[in-house]
Swiss-Prot record:
The chain crosses the membrane at residues 246-270, 278-296, 312-333, 472-490. Gene3D superfamilies: Neurotransmitter-gated ion-channel ligand-binding domain, Neurotransmitter-gated ion-channel transmembrane domain. The modification Phosphotyrosine is found at residue 390. GO terms for molecular function: acetylcholine binding; acetylcholine receptor activity; acetylcholine-gated monoatomic cation-selective channel activity; ligand-gated monoatomic ion channel activity; transmitter-gated monoatomic ion channel activity involved in regulation of postsynaptic membrane potential. The gene is Chrnd. Residues 1-21 form the signal peptide. Its main location: membrane. It catalyses: K(+)(in) = K(+)(out); Na(+)(in) = Na(+)(out). It is a multi-pass membrane protein. Keywords: Cell membrane, Disulfide bond, Glycoprotein, Ion channel, Ion transport, Ligand-gated ion channel, Membrane, Phosphoprotein, Postsynaptic cell membrane, Receptor, Signal, Synapse, Transmembrane, Transmembrane helix, Transport. Glycans are attached at residues 97, 164, 190. Disulfide bonds join 151-165. It comes from Rattus norvegicus (Rat). This is Acetylcholine receptor subunit delta. InterPro entries: Neur_chan_lig-bd (IPR006202), Neur_chan_lig-bd_sf (IPR036734), Neur_channel (IPR006201), Neuro-gated_channel_TM_sf (IPR036719), Neuro_actylchol_rec (IPR038050), Neurotrans-gated_channel_TM (IPR006029), Neurotransmitter_ion_chnl_CS (IPR018000), Nicotinic_acetylcholine_rcpt (IPR002394).
Amino acid sequence: MAGPVPTLGLLAALVVCGSWGLNEEQRLIQHLFEEKGYNKELRPVARKEDIVDVALSLTLSNLISLKEVEETLTTNVWIDHAWIDSRLQWNANEFGNITVLRLPSDMVWLPEIVLENNNDGSFQISYACNVLVSDSGHVTWLPPAIFRSSCPISVTYFPFDWQNCSLKFSSLKYTAKEIRLSLKQEEEDNRSYPIEWIIIDPEGFTENGEWEIVHRAAKVNVDPSVPMDSTNHQDVTFYLIIRRKPLFYIINILVPCVLISFMINLVFYLPGDCGEKTSVAISVLLAQSVFLLLISKRLPATSMAIPLVGKFLLFGMVLVTMVVVICVIVLNIHFRTPSTHVLSEGVKKFFLETLPKLLHMSRPEEEDPGPRALIRRTSSLGYISKAEEYFSLKSRSDLMFEKQSERHGLARRLTTARKPPASSEQVQQELFNEMKPAVDGANFIVNHMRDQNSYNEEKDNWNQVARTVDRLCLFVVTPVMVVGTAWIFLQGVYNQPPPQPFPGDPFSYDEQDRRFI
């Protein structure tokens, strides 16, 4: 029986202590809000002309996304509010040494700080967490929030661009005569310094895969041209200068675009007879149009600037269109014939002699008649003389029925038939009359072959002119494509964020560069 009695006594003591602690906190709350008559609608000042100092700081936990089409920056942040409320002061010794009191945010006065440049119509902080109140009247409120802020996008150097996205906080309820916005201060070695940067905890920060943070400055802006009675007189702005990581766009957009655009040079290597020169050029043009359509869906519909990729695609499309026109002209030249066009001597000299030498084009040389051709020509004269002798000795009946008599078994003539003696003029006339049809036929064949060779040679000259134009265009288009591509994309490579957040201000607004007060 002795064992359970001490146990029950210990439990009773714990319950009494717990109830006493709860009673002290409850008594403190009653003292602050009921006995003192706390009113959360009134500013925590003794006189009307007094100003409440509100200090702000921002902790970035995640840069979620930047939607270029909507021009919206989505961030996950913690915004720290701090101010002095003299009505919430107490003596800790009178209330069980309670130095910190956690209260719902709807029980105390709030400065109503909102994100002025929000992009979703939600000005207020959605999650109202508790406030921390110390016995000295110092109030701290650290609510988390997911902000969707407006961020004007500059597409000039896409995808080698950087953006300056800011989060502008101000009070839409109180003017500069009622509250004074400032940056929160920290102490180090008995010296205080303002937090002039966005706080990032390396352990709690999630890095974005598309953007990297270059500068994260914080600054209080006061516009003296705006009267203090206006809510636009002052604000606290947190600047996020971010740079795009272009690797994704280089692999998926730039490299395919460049490769497809340079394929247009292969058109000048295709022979005119294949009939695919224009088809290849038009296919490249269609592919560039598809890429341009994809990029237009990625960027905001703005007429302020043209992105680098858009400039390159437009440059390539203009060049490809010119190549299509050149292909049509080259095909027209290639299929020209002597029956439709005449190749002038000036064009022949320029495109068949001068330009090929400059473009290092080689053409098979024409073969000169050699000694074998002369031997063949002299030997043919012997055949002709033998034929004349044969025709002069044979009678017409034998010439006409020689084979037929052999088929019927008739003996050949042992002696040659000779015509009665005639004058030499008659013999020559008869021989001429007999040989004239054959000679005329041979002359016709020779003239026809000569005309055909001349026709083919002229047609080959037109083909060579077309090849020369192709080679000339290849030597012109390729350097233009290379220089144009390098000039366009080097603009983006050298487009870097400024070394300091604000032009003309040498201060870096970084944790390592603190300005002590």
